[in-house]
């Protein structure tokens, strides 16, 4: 600090760090996550607000092409050209440069408006010798976000509009911080994809009663690829979590949640996954009236209902059986009751 005479709070930094991460704690989801090795200046005074900008360089050196893909493309080496070689598992190094700029200001009493943008520039390391040819070049990724925090006597609320453009727009419930190398190699070209994400989440407290909520919606399109590749998707999620404080260290809490996700493919087909949950828990923590208080011990029972056949339970039934790679036989179920204990701590 104290590097600039016109801005005493400005900080110049260099090194490895988590940088201005934004998280929806109810979903345990970081919707803005830029991190790694880099440098920058943050909280510089500019007009009525604060300006921050940073540069990061991330290396994805464990990225590899699956062996079966060698039958679909050509594997190139500097001293020769191989075709259809199933015995080779090609690897390459992709360095992603990330340029982040952010400006925040007090929009009115009790409110904070934040404007942020990030440019992701992927670069293939030519010194690694091996790469898959005849594949689309990775395009740049872009993230733009506008968020508004409101703080009031009963609690707080955050509203976000986020736009993601390019190969970092591949998945719902994503944050745009990574380039979707895998899908690009597998034929699902997301270079021209774009995604909108809308979030609203917060908490309030009235006496011994508290309440938290999370609302999320996303829609994306512009994907290209094979007939079975994704063309577009959309998803919606809503969660409410009321609680009642029993003592200084205990409370009863409930949680109701719903999600739906629809994916449309290039061949016109589509599929939808959706589910609901209901949880009731007895909770112990040092300050039961504060939802951030940790460590927190929960004794809970949860009811789940879903049409997602990935939610499988072991069954001796041979009807509609699913055989896993290890030979275990499962039968799909659309509902389940789970109970147990859970300990959560933050540090």
Feature locations, PLM:
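Surface-exposed loop and membrane-interface regions of Gram-negative outer-membrane beta-barrel proteins
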Residues: 1-8, 18-31, 64-66, 70-90, ...
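Tandem-repeat/low-complexity and Cys-motif detector
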Residues: 90-92, 104-106, 230, 330-332
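Outer-membrane beta-barrel "beta-signal"
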Residues: 280, 284-286, 330-347
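Outer-envelope exported proteins of Gram-negative bacteria
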Residues: 13-15, 214, 241, 253-255, ...
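Detector for outer-membrane/organellar transmembrane beta-barrel domains
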Residues: 99-267, 272-280, 284
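Phosphate/oxyanion-binding active-site loops and adjacent basic polyanion-contact surfaces
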Residues: 30-34, 93, 232, 272-278, ...
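C-terminal structured domain segments
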Residues: 269-328
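Outer membrane beta-barrel
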Residues: 1-71, 94-116, 301-309
């Amino acid at each position: 600090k104290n590097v600039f005479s016109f801005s005493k709070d400005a900080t110049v930094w260099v090194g490895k760090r988590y940088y201005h991460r934004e998280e929806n704690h109810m979903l345990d989801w970081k919707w803005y996550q830029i991190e790694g090795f880099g440098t920058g200046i943050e909280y510089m005074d500019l007009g009525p607000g604060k300006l921050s900008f940073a540069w990061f360089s991330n290396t994805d050196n464990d990225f590899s092409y699956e062996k079966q893909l060698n039958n679909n493309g050509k594997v190139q080496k500097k001293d020769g050209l191989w075709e259809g070689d199933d015995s080779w598992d090609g690897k390459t190094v992709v360095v992603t440069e990330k340029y982040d700029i952010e400006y925040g200001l007090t929009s009115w009493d009790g409110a904070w408006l934040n404007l942020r943008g990030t440019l992701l520039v992927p670069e293939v390391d030519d010194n690694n010798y091996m790469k898959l040819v005849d594949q689309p070049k990775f395009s740049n990724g872009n993230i733009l976000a506008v968020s508004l925090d409101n703080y009031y006597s009963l609690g707080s609320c955050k509203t976000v509009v986020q736009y993601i453009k390019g190969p970092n727009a591949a998945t719902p419930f994503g944050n745009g911080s990574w380039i979707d190398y895998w899908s690009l190699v597998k034929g699902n070209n997301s270079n021209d994809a774009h995604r909108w994400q809308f979030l609203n989440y917060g908490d309030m407290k009235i006496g011994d009663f508290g309440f938290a909520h999370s609302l999320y919606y996303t829609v994306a399109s512009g994907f290209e690829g094979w007939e079975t590749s994704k063309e577009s998707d959309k998803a919606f999620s809503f969660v409410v979590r009321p609680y009642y404080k029993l003592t200084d260290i205990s409370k009863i809490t409930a949680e109701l949640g719903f999600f739906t996700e629809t994916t449309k493919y290039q061949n016109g087909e589509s599929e939808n996954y959706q589910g609901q949950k209901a949880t009731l828990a007895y909770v112990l923590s040092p300050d039961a009236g504060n939802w951030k208080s940790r460590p927190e011990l929960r004794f809970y029972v949860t009811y789940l209902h879903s049409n997602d056949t990935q939610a499988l339970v072991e069954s001796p039934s041979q009807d509609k059986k699913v055989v896993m790679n290890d030979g275990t036989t499962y039968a799909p179920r659309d509902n389940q009751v789970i109970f147990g204990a859970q300990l959560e701590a933050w540090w």
